[in-house]
Each structure stands twice: as structure tokens, then as C-alpha cells.
Swiss-Prot record:
Residues 1-21 have a biased composition (Acidic residues). Residues 226-238 are annotated as: Loop L3. The lineage of its organism: Eukaryota, Metazoa, Chordata, Craniata, Vertebrata. It comes from Homo sapiens (Human). The gene is CASP7. Highly expressed in lung, skeletal muscle, liver, kidney, spleen and heart, and moderately in testis. No expression in the brain. Changing residue 239 to A: Abolished phosphorylation by PAK2. Gene3D superfamilies: 3.40.50.1460, Caspase-like. The keyword Ubl conjugation applies. GO terms for cellular component: cytoplasm; cytosol; extracellular space; fibrillar center; nucleoplasm; nucleus; plasma membrane. PANTHER family: CASPASE (PTHR10454), CASPASE-7 (PTHR10454:SF31). Changing residue 239 to E: Mimics phosphorylation; leading to inactivate thiol protease activity. This is Caspase-7. Changing residue 192 to A: Strongly reduced thiol protease activity.
Length: 303
């Protein structure tokens, strides 16, 4: 059971600002590994501008009164019965995400330490709001997790139960609009050792075409890690995934398409972060985010 910390925490043991940890249920009680994320020197080079024609037919319409709502659920503290430790560093993630998504134009609201029922209620109510004048919707979940589930402060809830409120048959005012979910949580307990590297056309035959939209269409899920693996977090700096996501969005959030943005996030997490620990089991581990897209068009946050 994990999320984004670089160490498995012992109950009652506090993280130092330099430790990375994985949000997992403690199962190695004999140690708390000392970890830090090692970032390669960040050489910011303005990438050579590649001009690519945008084809409106294949882009989401962003010409709305507002960009949309962004809900951030930031779970840091957990009931003792869950066996989960405090997610030190998650407040840095929440703060960075709030600033980043607000600068993109989202109306951002942060909720802290939510129970499973509270998370369900928040998202159900959000799905029942009128999004007619909004271009899209975003939700960011910061918590402990396992594959397919995420922790509220009092236990686990299926991620699908949270996102299903926004299906096309349940949230009509977001039909054919992008629904974005960013999930910073572990998806298992496997560790990535890494490996050394050498360095269609629209059918417009009908004047007023009628068509059905799959209820699961227009969703995007950006996970901090692949299925089965830990996700790392630094109590001093925040999670690797969120650090990279905010950095790329600040640089290119208004000029790159969402999949280009998330591909760069993948690259940054994969190349710029690595754990170090006195315990060989947690030494020099890597992480790669995972994107699952059911988007049907290209998404640019600027018109």
C-alpha cells in the first residue's frame, strides 16, 4: 500500500526533510531508509520551436467562459486503524499544484484529509454542478494507494468509484469535454531497479450528423507510477511526479498539447530522479509515470 514516498515509514518515526518515501503500509519495521532524490543539473534550454499546424477539427474547443474547476484532494494524516503513516511533503505538492493550475486558468479548490465518504461526496457534487460554461474539469488525488484504490483518511476506496461520477451518461454538462485526473499514489510494492542505457478523416456525409459518445470517452488518467510499483515522495521537496508535472506545466502549459506535456513529465521523472539508501533494497531505485488516455481530441490549455 503505497503512494509517493521514498521510504516505508515506521509508526512514530518522523521523516527528515531529506528523505524520500513510498506511501506503503509499514512492513519492514527494522529500518527507516535514508533517501534523497538526486536531480541531474537542470539545464534549461529553450527547445527549438517546432511549428506544427493545429487542426481545429481534432482539438477540444476551449472557447468557453472559463477553463474549469480543479479539485485537489490532499490526504496527509490517516486514522491509526489504516496503518498508514503521515505523508510529509504532500503539502508542498498541494501548494505547487494550486499555484500551477491556477496560473493555467483553473478555479482551484484544495480539500485536506478527506475520508472515503468525503471524497465520494465531493466528486459526486462536483459532477452534479453545471459545467456548461467550462471547457474541462481536473481532479488531483494526493494520498497513499494500491492498485486501483486510493486511501481516504479512514480507509480505501476504488478510484473508479470516484471518477465514474463524470461519465458521459452521468455528467451531461461535461459531455465531449476533457476530464483530467492526476493521481499521486503508489500502485503496489514493486521497486524499479532501472537499467543503464547507452545513452482518421471525419465523416461529414450528413449535414447534421447524429452520433453516440462512449460513456468512458474524454477521460485522461495521469498516474505517478505504473501498475504494481511504488511512487516516491520527498518530505522536503514533494513527490517526484508532482515536481516534474508542475515544472513542465510552468514551462509549456500554454503552448504544448497535454500528451506532449505528460511525455516530458515521464522523461523528467525517469532521468532526473533516483533514490539512495543505506539499505540495498531501496538503493538507486527509479520511477516512471503512466498515462492512460481516452481523450478523443488534442487538448491545449490555450485557445
Amino acid at each position: 500500500m503505497a503512494d509517493d514516498q521514498g521510504c516505508i515509514e515506521e509508526q512514530g518515526v518522523e521523516d527528515s526533510a531529506n528523505e524520500d518515501s513510498v506511501d506503503a503500509k509499514p512492513d519492514r519495521s527494522s529500518f527507516v531508509p535514508s533517501l534523497f532524490s538526486k536531480k541531474k543539473k537542470n539545464v534549461t534550454m529553450r527547445s527549438i520551436k517546432t511549428t506544427r499546424d493545429r487542426v481545429p477539427t481534432y482539438q477540444y474547443n476551449m472557447n468557453f467562459e472559463k477553463l474549469g474547476k480543479c479539485i485537489i484532494i490532499n490526504n496527509k494524516n490517516f486514522d491509526k486503524v489504516t496503518g498508514m503513516g503521515v505523508r510529509n511533503g504532500t503539502d508542498k505538492d498541494a501548494e505547487a499544484l494550486f499555484k500551477c493550475f491556477r496560473s493555467l486558468g483553473f478555479d482551484v479548490i484544495v480539500y485536506n484529509d478527506c475520508s472515503c465518504a468525503k471524497m465520494q461526496d465531493l466528486l459526486k457534487k462536483a459532477s452534479e454542478e453545471d459545467h456548461t460554461n467550462a471547457a474541462c474539469f481536473a481532479c488531483i488525488l494526493l494520498s497513499h494507494g494500491e492498485e486501483n484504490v486510493i486511501y481516504g483518511k479512514d480507509g480505501v476506496t476504488p478510484i473508479k468509484d470516484l471518477t465514474a461520477h463524470f461519465r458521459g451518461d452521468r455528467c451531461k454538462t461535461l459531455l465531449e469535454k476533457p476530464k483530467l485526473f492526476f493521481i499521486q499514489a503508489c500502485r503496489g510494492t514493486e521497486l524499479d531497479d532501472g537499467i543503464q542505457a547507452d545513452s482518421g478523416p471525419i465523416n461529414d456525409t450528413d449535414a447534421n450528423p447524429r452520433y453516440k459518445i462512449p460513456v468512458e470517452a474524454d477521460f485522461l488518467f495521469a498516474y505517478s507510477t505504473v501498475p504494481g510499483y511504488y511512487s516516491w515522495r520527498s518530505p522536503g521537496r514533494g513527490s517526484w511526479f508532482v515536481q516534474a508535472l508542475c515544472s513542465i506545466l510552468e514551462e509549456h502549459g500554454k503552448d504544448l498539447e497535454i500528451m506532449q506535456i505528460l511525455t516530458r513529465v515521464n522523461d523528467r521523472v525517469a532521468r532526473h530522479f533516483e533514490s539512495q539508501s543505506d539499505d540495498p533494497h531501496f538503493h538507486e531505485k527509479k520511477q516512471i509515470p503512466c498515462v492512460v488516455s481516452m481523450l478523443t481530441k488534442e487538448l491545449y490549455f490555450s485557445q
